[in-house]
Amino acid sequence: MMSLLLIPVTFITVAYFYQNKGMTDKKKIATFFEITKVCVQHKGELQYPIFIKEVEDDISINYVYKLPLGIPSQLIKKLAEVLEEGLYKPVKISFQQRELYIRVFKQQIPERWNWSKDLLKEHTWNVMIGKALDKHIYHDFEKTPHMCVSGMTRFGKTVFLKNIMTSLILQQPQHVKFHIIDLKEGLEFSPYKDLSQVVEVAENPEQALEMLVRVREKMVNQIEIMKKSYFNNIVDTSIKERCFIIVDEGANLCPTQGLPKKQRDLLYICQEMLSEIARIGGGLGFRLIFCTQYPTADTLPRQIKQNSDAKLGFRLPTAVASQVALDESGLEELPSLPGRALFKTDRTEEIQVPYLKDKDMWDLLKQYKVVKQHEASNPQTESKANRDFIHFE
């Protein structure tokens, strides 16, 4: 009868490898299997993974093993972290049927790297997110329209937002429009309000509400246009314009109990409108990027989180906060490096976000500066926008 032998504590493996620094990675892995009992016992005999081959490329060596019958997938998934401790190198593990692939990387994720125009994918909505161990990570806003961004202050959230804004403008200068809610009193994004692609920048909750009323009116109009053409998703139409609603520091829209009722009501309406964009805006060409410093059930509304299939998390202080941001722990374990993050879609990747200086951003975008007439909100937009809900009939 087969029985699974349990993995002992990691530090035993680390101590052993420390005493045997001259060993090759291949020998260390074989020894690791023995020390940690990554094996099955069958008829009194221990059966370990059998080495098949190794394949080397520029950035890694892939060790391929044949797994003995009976090792469960849960055990294999735990190997990467323990192997990294023993090899002192980044490791990725995958398995298919009974073959185990242990990919050992030669270098770590860079601690810092700079954004460049070479990263652009012209005439697409596919933008650079960051660099992982083995590849550049891009995100296609046509496939996944909404994104939540979380992380402590000074760890790269606003730099990331500016990266996205710069890439989208340079890739789609004629078709991208931005509605930006900068709740740091406009400190970060008001310098860009005169770009032709920036419709408006709201600097406080009152201005945010006025902006969202106008965005809602645009959504209502888009619904009418698409209903007449019998379309329900903008990617199936010839409409090229996409509207990005960026919220920098969404916690300032949280209707906390200590505020006056009028202010709480205003903030609640803002959150409801943003939730509505997240629910139905994707198919209409509206993309929400919602950013908050410390995610909680109040500061990251449930509808926004559930409808944002792309989630980017920079370092957070606790596993609880990481669970709120990504539905998994890990952000609390990231190194204290600005720009280091976890990006989650159908899988989770550790990445380093490229760095873009404000001066370099302006040098790239100043060609799109135009003379604008900044006006107060237009009360005529209230007719359709003030309905309680937007819905398809």
Residue locations for each model-derived region?
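Interdomain "pre-motor" coupling segment immediately N-terminal to P-loop NTPase/helicase cores
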Residues: 68-113
